[in-house]
Amino acid sequence: MVHAEAFSRPLSRNEVVGLIFRLTIFGAVTYFTIKWMVDAIDPTRKQKVEAQKQAEKLMKQIGVKNVKLSEYEMSIAAHLVDPLNMHVTWSDIAGLDDVITDLKDTVILPIKKKHLFENSRLLQPPKGVLLYGPPGCGKTLIAKATAKEAGCRFINLQPSTLTDKWYGESQKLAAAVFSLAIKLQPSIIFIDEIDSFLRNRSSSDHEATAMMKAQFMSLWDGLDTDHSCQVIVMGATNRPQDLDSAIMRRMPTRFHINQPALKQREAILKLILKNENVDRHVDLLEVAQETDGFSGSDLKEMCRDAALLCVREYVNSTSEESHDEDEIRPVQQQDLHRAIEKMKKSKDAAFQSVLTHVCLD
C-alpha cells in the first residue's frame, strides 16, 4: 500500500528529469502519429509531394537561385513553364499581324525596355490582358509566344489548383500565385478558359469559392499599387460575356482573336503546309476561299486529313513488305477538297446537334 506522504514529498532531480523525458517522448510520438494519420487520409498527399519535386526541378531549369518558397508557392510553382522550353514564336502564328503588333507595343516593349518607361506611369505594361474570341483561333498560342518573346516566367494556372478541401487553404493558394509571380518577375499568370474560374458572381456561389475569388481580385489590385511590378495576368476565353464585371475592369487591355478572314486563312494554310509534301500546283487561295468559317484549328485538322488520304491510298495499294515513305505522293488539290467536305459535314453535324439541344431545352 502506498502511503499518502509518498505523494506529498517533493520529487528528486532524477525523477523530474525522467518525467520530462517521458513526457517529451510521449509528445513526439503523439505528434508524428497524428501527422502520419492526417497524411494517410489525405488523398492529395502523393500529388503534393510530386508537385513539390516538379517545382524544385523547374526552379533549377529557369535558373532561380536563393529564392525561398513556401509550401503553397511550391504547389503553384509546379505549373511553371520555362520560356526556353516554349517552342512557340511569332513565326508560328499566321494571320494575326495586327494583334501581334499591338502586343509587342503594349506588353513586350515595356518589359524588355523597362528603362525607357520607368519614369511614366501611363507607359507601364498592363496588369491584365484578355484574349477573347471563338475557339481554335490561337489565343493560347499567342499567350505562350508573348511570354517567350518577353522572356517572362509563365505560370499556366489551372483553376483546380486553387481548390482545396480544407477551409482557408484556397485563399492561401490564391495568395501564393501572386507572391510567387512577384518573386519570379517578370512573369505572366495565364488562365485559359478564364470564364470557368472568374465568371459572374451570384448568391448561389459556395462560400469558399466566393472568398477565394475575392482574395484573388484583391491581390490582383495590389499589382496596380506597385508600378515597378512586372506581373501580368493574361486570360483567354470564348465567352467574355460570362466574365464578372470586376474582372473585366482589371483587364483593360483586350484583344479580339476572331475567325480568320480570307487572306488570314491563306497565310495560315501556307504556314501549316510549309514543310509538308505538297504538289506545286495546289492553289491555296482557292482552298482559303472554300474554307469560310474555319478556325485555325479547323484548317490544321483539314490539312491533316488531306495528308492522311495520301498515306491511306499508299498503304492500300502496296504490300506490307514494300513500304517506302518516298513513294507516298504529295498532297494534291483534290485531297484538300475532300478534306474540306469532310470537315464541313462534321461542323454541320455539330451545329445541328447544338440546335436540337437548344430546342429540347
UniProtKB/Swiss-Prot annotation:
<keyword id="KW-1133">Transmembrane helix</keyword>
<dbReference type="GO" id="GO:0099149">
    <property type="term" value="P:regulation of postsynaptic neurotransmitter receptor internalization"/>
</dbReference>
<keyword id="KW-0576">Peroxisome</keyword>
<keyword id="KW-0547">Nucleotide-binding</keyword>
<keyword id="KW-0067">ATP-binding</keyword>
<dbReference type="GO" id="GO:0045211">
    <property type="term" value="C:postsynaptic membrane"/>
</dbReference>
<dbReference type="GO" id="GO:0005778">
    <property type="term" value="C:peroxisomal membrane"/>
</dbReference>
<keyword id="KW-0496">Mitochondrion</keyword>
<dbReference type="InterPro" id="IPR027417">
    <property type="entry name" value="P-loop_NTPase"/>
</dbReference>
<dbReference type="GO" id="GO:0005524">
    <property type="term" value="F:ATP binding"/>
</dbReference>
<keyword id="KW-1000">Mitochondrion outer membrane</keyword>
<feature type="binding site">
    <location>
        <begin position="133"/>
        <end position="140"/>
    </location>
    <ligand>
        <name>ATP</name>
    </ligand>
</feature>
<dbReference type="GO" id="GO:0005741">
    <property type="term" value="C:mitochondrial outer membrane"/>
</dbReference>
<protein>
    <recommendedName>
        <fullName>Outer mitochondrial transmembrane helix translocase</fullName>
        <ecNumber>7.4.2.-</ecNumber>
    </recommendedName>
</protein>
<dbReference type="GO" id="GO:0140570">
    <property type="term" value="P:extraction of mislocalized protein from mitochondrial outer membrane"/>
</dbReference>
<dbReference type="InterPro" id="IPR041569">
    <property type="entry name" value="AAA_lid_3"/>
</dbReference>
<keyword id="KW-0770">Synapse</keyword>
<keyword id="KW-1003">Cell membrane</keyword>
<dbReference type="GO" id="GO:0098978">
    <property type="term" value="C:glutamatergic synapse"/>
</dbReference>
<keyword id="KW-0472">Membrane</keyword>
<dbReference type="GO" id="GO:0140567">
    <property type="term" value="F:membrane protein dislocase activity"/>
</dbReference>
<dbReference type="InterPro" id="IPR003960">
    <property type="entry name" value="ATPase_AAA_CS"/>
</dbReference>
<feature type="topological domain" description="Cytoplasmic">
    <location>
        <begin position="33"/>
        <end position="361"/>
    </location>
</feature>
<dbReference type="GO" id="GO:0007613">
    <property type="term" value="P:memory"/>
</dbReference>
<feature type="modified residue" description="Phosphoserine">
    <location>
        <position position="322"/>
    </location>
</feature>
<dbReference type="GO" id="GO:0007612">
    <property type="term" value="P:learning"/>
</dbReference>
<dbReference type="InterPro" id="IPR003959">
    <property type="entry name" value="ATPase_AAA_core"/>
</dbReference>
<dbReference type="InterPro" id="IPR051701">
    <property type="entry name" value="Mito_OM_Translocase_MSP1"/>
</dbReference>
<feature type="transmembrane region" description="Helical">
    <location>
        <begin position="16"/>
        <end position="32"/>
    </location>
</feature>
<dbReference type="GO" id="GO:0098794">
    <property type="term" value="C:postsynapse"/>
</dbReference>
<comment type="similarity">
    <text>Belongs to the AAA ATPase family. MSP1 subfamily.</text>
</comment>
<dbReference type="GO" id="GO:0016887">
    <property type="term" value="F:ATP hydrolysis activity"/>
</dbReference>
<keyword id="KW-0812">Transmembrane</keyword>
<keyword id="KW-0597">Phosphoprotein</keyword>
<dbReference type="Pfam" id="PF00004">
    <property type="entry name" value="AAA"/>
</dbReference>
<dbReference type="GO" id="GO:0051967">
    <property type="term" value="P:negative regulation of synaptic transmission, glutamatergic"/>
</dbReference>
<feature type="topological domain" description="Mitochondrial intermembrane">
    <location>
        <begin position="1"/>
        <end position="15"/>
    </location>
</feature>
<keyword id="KW-0628">Postsynaptic cell membrane</keyword>
<comment type="function">
    <text>Outer mitochondrial translocase required to remove mislocalized tail-anchored transmembrane proteins on mitochondria. Specifically recognizes and binds tail-anchored transmembrane proteins: acts as a dislocase that mediates the ATP-dependent extraction of mistargeted tail-anchored transmembrane proteins from the mitochondrion outer membrane. Also plays a critical role in regulating the surface expression of AMPA receptors (AMPAR), thereby regulating synaptic plasticity and learning and memory.</text>
</comment>
<dbReference type="Pfam" id="PF17862">
    <property type="entry name" value="AAA_lid_3"/>
</dbReference>
<dbReference type="GO" id="GO:0002092">
    <property type="term" value="P:positive regulation of receptor internalization"/>
</dbReference>
<keyword id="KW-1278">Translocase</keyword>
